[in-house]
């Protein structure tokens, strides 16, 4: 099965299924000499792991990561870093009654048609459980980017269903179960999600992820433009149906005189482009938005077919997220970190001695 590796110089390969024995990753290309422990990865994994609030799946996984290789005496060696997370709370019996049915809106049908065989337990490889390893690998990239380049990455939920953030308070993002940035909306979100769970339904969401301190020059035109690579990374996250950089789809209603980002000697006057011009980072904040669909794993009956093509009706039982956008925040952060780390190494490889007389703006 192809498509399990991401990146060129900083390469991440993941393996494992939702109800398998374990999940794993091999991280190639991490520079040597960086201090690294399992605790450095665990923080982001704890933010993503299931069962941390009543508004996410109640599957209980500790998601404790083990570093198997690539670290000696607390420092990276420059060799492959092996990572492993054991699965401990699989309930495969929840799926035994639907093993011959295709859950509508899921990857069941397409995986079956492509490979002729599929792991029906929790979606197998197509499950968002796989993203735990992306978060672990992304934590390595985030640590290097912050310590060596001053690049920091954070994300937050901007909209859940009809509820939109109307103000931004970064200090509360990590202090509520929604990763929401508007403190005035938390009670409304709580009530909305409680009602949604009673209905047995799900809802979509929009989140934003931002990278600060990114230097000018990252990105490889024309086919590996930085924004193209970011879109590729984000679209690879389960349930993501749309990605925008900067003002994104709002540019449709903007005039050129409004959208362009004027420059003065002391910096840019705006950032409609989201920190990327011509596929290359401009030195401003990189701003990325993601739209995630409502999960199809719901208690509302839906029409489908079985393996023989016979009509059927089904309800998806088991433990599922009523809004997958909530736990997608640390996943999106990780994917942005992987892109920036890869392009940082690629930029150094080709352009480490490039010097211009033009000042670097922010």
UniProtKB/Swiss-Prot annotation:
Residues binding NADP(+), per UniProt: 48, 54
Record key words, sorted: Amino-acid biosynthesis, Aromatic amino acid biosynthesis, FAD, Flavoprotein, FMN, Lyase, NADP
Named cofactor requirement(s): FMNH2
Residues reported to bind FMN: 125-127, 238-239, 278, 293-297, 319
Pathway assignment: Metabolic intermediate biosynthesis; chorismate biosynthesis; chorismate from D-erythrose 4-phosphate and phosphoenolpyruvate: step 7/7
Catalytic reactions of this protein: 5-O-(1-carboxyvinyl)-3-phosphoshikimate = chorismate + phosphate
CDD domains, per the entry: Chorismate_synthase
Gene3D superfamilies: Chorismate synthase AroC
GO-annotated biological processes: amino acid biosynthetic process; aromatic amino acid family biosynthetic process; chorismate biosynthetic process
Top-tier EC class: lyase
Cofactor detail note: Reduced FMN (FMNH(2)).
Cellular component, GO annotation: cytosol
Pfam families per record: Chorismate_synt (PF01264)
Gene Ontology molecular-function annotations: chorismate synthase activity; FMN binding
Cited InterPro entries: Chorismate_synth, Chorismate_synth_AroC_sf, Chorismate_synthase_CS
Domain of life: Bacteria
EC number in record: 4.2.3.5
HAMAP family assigned: Chorismate_synth
Function: This reaction introduces a second double bond into the aromatic ring system.
Family to which this protein belongs: Belongs to the chorismate synthase family.
Subunit structure: Homotetramer.
Protein known as: Chorismate synthase
Origin species: Tolumonas auensis (strain DSM 9187 / NBRC 110442 / TA 4)
């Amino acid at each position: 099965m192809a498509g399990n590796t991401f990146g060129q110089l900083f390469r991440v390969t993941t393996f494992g299924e939702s109800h398998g024995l374990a999940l794993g990753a091999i991280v190639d290309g991490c520079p040597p000499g960086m201090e690294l422990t399992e605790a450095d990865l665990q923080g982001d994994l704890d933010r993503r792991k299931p069962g941390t609030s009543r508004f996410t799946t109640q599957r209980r996984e500790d998601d404790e990561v083990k570093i198997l290789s690539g670290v000696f005496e607390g420092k990276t060696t420059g060799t492959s870093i092996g990572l492993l997370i054991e699965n401990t709370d699989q309930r495969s019996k929840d799926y035994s009654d639907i093993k011959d049915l295709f859950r509508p809106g899921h990857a069941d049908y397409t995986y079956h048609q492509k490979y002729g065989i599929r792991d029906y337990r929790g979606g197998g490889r197509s499950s968002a459980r796989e993203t735990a390893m992306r978060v672990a690998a992304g934590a390595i990239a985030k640590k290097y980017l912050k310590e060596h380049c001053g690049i920091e990455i954070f994300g937050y939920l901007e909209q859940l269903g009809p509820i939109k953030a109307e103000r931004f308070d970064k200090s509360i993002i990590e202090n509520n179960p929604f990763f929401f940035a508007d403190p005035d909306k938390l009670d409304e979100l709580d009530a909305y999600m409680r009602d949604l769970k009673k209905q047995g339904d799900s809802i979509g969401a929009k989140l934003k992820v931002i990278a600060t301190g990114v230097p000018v020059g990252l990105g490889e035109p024309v086919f590996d433009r930085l924004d193209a690579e970011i879109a590729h990374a984000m679209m690879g996250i389960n349930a993501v149906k749309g990605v925008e950089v900067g003002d994104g789809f709002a540019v449709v209603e903007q005039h050129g005189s409004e959208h362009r980002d004027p420059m003065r000697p002391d910096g840019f006057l705006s950032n409609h482009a989201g920190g990327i011009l011509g596929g290359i980072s401009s030195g401003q904040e990189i701003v990325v938005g993601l739209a995630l669909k409502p999960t199809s794993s719901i208690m509302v009956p839906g029409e489908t077919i079985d393996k023989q093509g016979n009509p059927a009706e089904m309800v998806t039982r088991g433990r599922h997220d009523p809004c997958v956008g909530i736990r997608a925040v640390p996943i999106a952060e990780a994917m942005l970190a992987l892109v920036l780390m890869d392009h940082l190494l690629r930029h150094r490889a080709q352009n480490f001695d490039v010097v211009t007389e033009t000042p670097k703006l922010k």
